């Protein structure tokens, strides 16, 4: 990761903590790793997949559930760090430079877990997704197609947001910031996906997990809005306090 020596940082000048090649490698590794496991692991190590639940292997389902919670948590953490950057709370702790880098890094790793979460389901005998059904939103017809589709759309919007960071100099900071606001929609889509498609949603632990993370993020977003409005009012008052220049003859 790149280090910064000053808390006074222009966000528009920050370089990616992971270069484009590294980002592509991480995503490719998640894609190929899940694809290989889903397609070839049952033939290579049948005892491994059957050991979880006997004759009807659910190892892939458990892997998908675990990676789903990991992807959601990393997306949530990235959002939380992002709100801390904009409302300046990160200056207090852990500091603006590490917060910016963690914000970027958690987004990328969260995307990788999200990709793995979908791809590994190709090995599950109950859902039996094809590659096209995993990659194309709302292409499934068996298991909760709407809820699954919302998660797929959330993944692609997060992917677009992440890629836009690498194209920021080409598209301009204004366009990039507009795209970045889609991250709030992304979180909502992923949260709904988890609540409706997750088999653990009825568990108290999962409900508390979603409630605490969602509530904390909502508080941070609300705080960000209030701080932005207060700063705008303060700036307006300062401009109004400046005496007008005398007319020149």
Annotated model-derived regions:
Residues 1-249:
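Membrane-embedded alpha-helical bundles that constitute the cytochrome b-like, heme-associated redox core
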